Amino acid sequence: MNDKFGKKRPDVAEANTLALKAGWNYGETAELFERNYQVQPAHLTPGTYTNVMGNQALAWGLVTAANLSNKELFYGSYPITPASPVLEELSNFKNYGVKTFQAEDEIAAICSAIGAAFGGSMALTGSSGPGIALKGEAMGLAMILELPMLILKVQRGGPST
């Protein structure tokens, strides 16, 4: 606060510092939740470990499944958080026959996956909450046609769209 406001407006710096301390103290002392959770540091034996995010692991699993089933993997998607990393990770596996398509909207994304399923590929599309809602009509088409297709719904951490 002093670095930002201290020289020109010491009164603003002091007011902001007091507000910060009051908020901190309130958060530490208010019993707003029934339980407190604390995650202790993991005790790992020495060795080599790989740090993998969930979307990255999902992408690796999809590539493996396509490879084991002797199918080309097609992923048509419109970038939307938090599903975007799946598209980004799958685009790194062109040498495994993975085809990715960044569509102009959610409807085009699912329709591209429907086309890939018609063509015999392991077809996927993915999105998050509002994107899944936009795909609804085309999902109905895929179901009526009984096309094998995977639809990924990556959940957001909160209620926001």
Give, region by region, the residue ranges found by the protein language model.
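Accessory "access/gating" subregions that flank catalytic or transport cores
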Residues: 29, 37-102, 112-115
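Short, mixed-charge, low-aromatic patches
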Residues: 14-19, 42-47, 68-71, 148-159
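Ubiquitous "structural anchor" signal
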Residues: 31, 69, 137-139
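Terminal amphipathic helices with adjacent charged low-complexity linkers/tails
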Residues: 1-44
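Thiamine diphosphate
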Residues: 60, 81-161
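Short, charge-rich amphipathic segments
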Residues: 17-23, 45-48, 74-76, 127-139
